[in-house]
């Protein structure tokens, strides 16, 4: 997503929009990343152990394997993440779950042209089944 379209001095939340179907399984760990230009200070990557049913209501995270990198151009939230909340299912059957937030100070997030968000599971070679991802939604949120 091009960061030029983001409002300055605004906090945003990223949501994954998805559906699950019969026999949904195989999603034990995911990584969530906000990636900027090539140096470690220009990116933030969090690793979350979400259990096999990570899209279920109120699942606890284990933060022991978390890695964070910060940029001086953007401020990322550092509050402890205690649970993932599944939002209400929309009229169209799609659900949305928040998986991260960031603050765009201005002049483009992280001094780059794009923001990249990923949901990945590469550590476990188990078959994945039953998850349909519509996309990632970026929404402005109220300041804490």
UniProtKB/Swiss-Prot annotation:
Domain of life: Eukaryota
MF terms in GO: carbohydrate binding
Protein name (Swiss-Prot/TrEMBL): Putative protein PHLOEM PROTEIN 2-LIKE B4
Pfam family name, one: PP2
UniProt cross-references to InterPro entries, sorted A to Z: PP2-like
